[in-house]
């Protein structure tokens, strides 16, 4: 057990992933998950996916730098492991960006955004960020292990306060799986979208 210096160390592990998730949503409002120009080339699905993900991740790195700089130097948040906090926060940003890229690519811009907002609402109530998940209704306790923000909160709580045990490495493994799995699905979807059909060449008219 590690000692927290104040409320900041207690609430930061919840609000930092929340900010990163919302930041990822805004990023994909500004950028195309699958660039149209890349889809029109013979590039593989992975290259098309990375053509969308890399610029988004660059914005994610900038967001992490600004966010951690503000909470540490501006608000005085104590970081027991600065390197660990930076590295883990970058992993969280990558996982959230890849997950949202995948949802938007697979479901489409409109349905994808609805799914992202629904996922955000579920994670706010079930991640155990502000109070123990054991005190929440049974539904939220049941979905807690299946939502990425649960592991983002747990991992950040450990690297910020200095408690490094198996839960941190489980969180790293799960978020890495989310990031790589999402990128793989997006690459598959990009490959499918490069196959032109009559419906895509001649879309139905809506009056």
Predicted feature residues:
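Membrane-spanning alpha-helical segments of multipass transporters and channels
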Residues: 1-207
């Amino acid at each position: 057990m590690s000692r927290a210096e104040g409320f900041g160390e207690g609430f930061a592990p919840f609000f930092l992933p929340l900010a990163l998730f919302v930041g990822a949503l805004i990023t994909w409002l500004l950028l195309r998950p699958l660039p149209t120009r890349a889809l029109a080339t013979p590039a593989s699905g992975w290259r098309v996916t990375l053509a969308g993900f890399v610029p988004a991740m660059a914005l994610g790195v900038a967001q992490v730098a600004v966010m951690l700089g503000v909470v540490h130097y501006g608000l005085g948040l104590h970081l027991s492991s600065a390197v660990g906090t930076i590295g883990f926060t970058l992993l969280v940003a990558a996982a959230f960006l890849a997950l949202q890229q995948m949802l938007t690519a697979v479901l489409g811009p409109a349905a994808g955004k609805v799914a992202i907002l629904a996922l955000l609402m579920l994670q706010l109530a079930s991640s155990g960020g502000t109070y123990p998940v054991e005190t929440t209704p049974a539904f939220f306790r049941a979905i807690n292990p299946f939502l990425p923000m649960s592991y983002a909160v747990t991992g950040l709580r450990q690297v910020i306060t200095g408690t490094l045990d198996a839960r941190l490495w489980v969180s790293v493994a799960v978020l890495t799986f989310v990031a790589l799995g999402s990128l793989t699905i997006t690459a598959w979807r990009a490959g499918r979208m490069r196959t032109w059909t009559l419906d895509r060449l001649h879309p139905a008219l809506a009056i």
